[in-house]
Amino acid sequence: MDPCECSKTGTCNCGGSCTCKNCSCTTCTKSCCPCCPSGCPKCASGCVCKGKTCDTTCCQ
C-alpha cells in the first residue's frame, strides 16, 4: 500500500502517526513531502518517514 495518496485524495498517512493534508506530492511513494524536516523541499522517492519527519537522507 502506498502511504502517500496525495495525488488521489489530497491526504495521506506516513510513519504511522504522521498525517499530511493538502499535500502536493506526486512522485513520493513511501513518504509525504510535508513530513520532511524544515529546509527539506522534497522527499526522495522511496523515502520512509520516521516518526513525524523523514530523516535528512530523504531530502533531494
UniProtKB/Swiss-Prot annotation:
A divalent metal cation 4 binds at C32, C33, C43, C47. A divalent metal cation 1 binds at C4, C6, C20, C23. It holds the Pfam family Metallothio. The modification N-acetylmethionine is found at M1. Residues 29-60 are annotated as: Alpha. This is Metallothionein. Belongs to the metallothionein superfamily. Type 1 family. A divalent metal cation 5 binds at C33, C35, C36, C49.
